[in-house]
Amino acid sequence: MRAAVVAVGARALGTLQRGRTPASYRKRSSIVLVLLPPSEGKADSGRGAPLKPESLSLPGLAEARAAVLDELVELCVTDEEKAREVLGLSEGLRGEIAKNTELRVAGARPAGDIYTGVLYDALGLATLDAVAKRRATKALLVFSGLWGAVRINDRIPSYRCSMGVKLPGLGALGAYWRGPMAEALPEAAGDGLVLDLRSSAYANAWKPKGELAERTATVRVLHAQMVNGVEKRSVVSHFNKATKGRLVRDLLMAGAKPAGPGELVTVLRDLGYVVEAEAPGRAGRAWALDVVVTEIH
């Protein structure tokens, strides 16, 4: 359990290069739902058709989305300085406020193109093969302070509004989204495994409960280093994000559909990851997985 691990192990690399997936993984029919955080920075919307709110996935979130959109645009249109304070923007990011004022008319792009940063660079959606891209469209759900949650093929404009924001009239968005999410997310999860890779602010917006929690696995990435002959482990943001992105990519490329957290551990180990698992101590709790890394290439 102390061996070094890179994003893709030798066994995994051989499997993917040969285009084979273990038969036990291919037989599964249930969809794994992967919960991701958004990126703080985002790609420009570019030109194109504007947002069509009615076209977004999870229509049960439509009313809540409209309310957040209204409050955000109103704030940014009427009081730029207050908007900068509420959104937690530095002076150099003041231009993000102008983007928010144009959310209803700005060009919209697939969310998978909008979100950038370490996790999404490692995930590499644009370089997945066609089959893996279809899997990603079904499996990935990106949480958002503005939209609640979207699929990667949902077309959205670039925006600035994190889950930690407190909007006038709505309050803290993490708390605001809990009710709508509690209604919409269990249906999206279906009866399959939920792989929760969200950061704490976004995890606060929805926590699986009951039987659904028992088939949910959260992942923590630990960086292991030898210090004076003793192994020390810590959470390092870059390693955490990059490893999660590559882990999702490997699962998509392998076509793995583990039926539950225990089988997920087996799949990840087969893909070359060093995984330590802790089953929940009581009913209605999620599994906690630690992925231990020493370096990222």
Q: Which residues does each predicted region cover?
A:
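Short, Lys/Arg-enriched N-terminal segments with co-localized hydrophobic residues
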Residues: L16-I31, F239
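Intrinsically disordered, low-complexity boundary segments flanking structured domains
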Residues: R20-Y25, N100-G107, M181-A184, A203-K209
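Compositionally biased, low-complexity flexible segments
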Residues: M1-A23
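Internal, well-folded beta-alpha domain core
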Residues: L125-H297
